[in-house]
Amino acid sequence: MPPKSGKGQKKAGKAKGAPRSDKKRRRKRKESYGIYIYKVMKQVHPDTGISSRAMSIMNSFVNDIFERIAAEASRLAHYNKKSTITSREVQTAVRLLLPGELAKHAVSEGTKAVTKYTTSK
């Protein structure tokens, strides 16, 4: 005799309710750094535009740098037997990954951003 509760039983057939064709399918959202790249570009060069291809390249670049910094910071935390990536690991990762003057500017801008964030809390 089959169990009376519906647990563990699979029913054949389609689920009841409105058919899928009636509903409008929503597109999956694509996340990107596009709006931020655009804002920074307008601060530096207010009269310049950017093509969608150039924006795609810049987005790939930002994603690549982000992944490299995250991987290096993770490695540094692991070497020091820490389970948390702090601003110190990120700063060291930036110093290791970026060359000379670019690293100095990135560290100073990062420090400025962290200070601004902590004071606004």
UniProtKB/Swiss-Prot annotation:
SMART domains: H2B
Locations listed in the record: Nucleus; Chromosome
Cross-link (Glycyl lysine isopeptide (Lys-Gly) (interchain with G-Cter in ubiquitin)): 116
Annotated Gene Ontology cellular component terms: nucleosome; nucleus
Residues where N,N-dimethylproline is found: 2
Region described as Disordered: 1-30
Similarity comment: family membership: Belongs to the histone H2B family.
Assembly behavior: The nucleosome is a histone octamer containing two molecules each of H2A, H2B, H3 and H4 assembled in one H3-H4 heterotetramer and two H2A-H2B heterodimers. The octamer wraps approximately 147 bp of DNA.
The name this protein goes by in its record: Histone H2B, sperm
